[in-house]
UniProtKB/Swiss-Prot annotation:
GO terms for biological process: angiogenesis; cellular response to leukemia inhibitory factor; endothelium development; establishment of Golgi localization; Golgi reassembly; intracellular signal transduction; intrinsic apoptotic signaling pathway in response to hydrogen peroxide; negative regulation of apoptotic process. GO terms for cellular component: cytoplasm; cytosol; extracellular exosome; FAR/SIN/STRIPAK complex; Golgi apparatus; Golgi membrane; plasma membrane. Ubiquitous. It is found in: Cytoplasm; Golgi apparatus membrane; Cell membrane. PANTHER family: PROGRAMMED CELL DEATH PROTEIN 10 (PTHR13250:SF1), TF-1 CELL APOPTOSIS RELATED PROTEIN-15 (PTHR13250). It is linked to Cerebral cavernous malformations 3: A form of cerebral cavernous malformations, a congenital vascular anomaly of the central nervous system that can result in hemorrhagic stroke, seizures, recurrent headaches, and focal neurologic deficits. The lesions are characterized by grossly enlarged blood vessels consisting of a single layer of endothelium and without any intervening neural tissue, ranging in diameter from a few millimeters to several centimeters. CCM3 inheritance is autosomal dominant. This is Programmed cell death protein 10.
Amino acid sequence: MRMTMEEMKNEAETTSMVSMPLYAVMYPVFNELERVNLSAAQTLRAAFIKAEKENPGLTQDIIMKILEKKSVEVNFTESLLRMAADDVEEYMIERPEPEFQDLNEKARALKQILSKIPDEINDRVRFLQTIKDIASAIKELLDTVNNVFKKYQYQNRRALEHQKKEFVKYSKSFSDTLKTYFKDGKAINVFVSANRLIHQTNLILQTFKTVA
């Protein structure tokens, strides 16, 4: 049975989403290793990137196996969210124009606020303020994306428009998840949705970096 375009997009999203642990967990490890042995770190990084590309989710499987072997009990989704705020070199836009650097800054700000959710979620007053901050950060990021659209012409504008729509879709999904959370109290669903929004934020940067 042939997949619809929407199903293909969803599968592609799931595939790239499952690779989040590569840059959220392993990249900081590689960066630390570079200080000790640059060559070994670069070789290991390249090997992980290649393996993850060929087998999406492999990094997550390896990490989970290590945790299991060491009998470490950890909420992986929550931990991933806490670590996902760091800049990822592969996603950062290198163009020096203020609009592009502003895009980097606004994306960083949103990711940092989202990554604080596990620390804020059990304090209702603080969490409500965090939700307001997230809404403001989302608006600021979208405003910056629109500013770049106005000032620069792109041959591949369709790809940028598509990624912007995806970001808006996941922003709305995050909002819906929050409404449900206040009814059922299931924090894990908020963490999952926040991770997806961080992933979409990175994809916006990646798309601009690719076509800019």
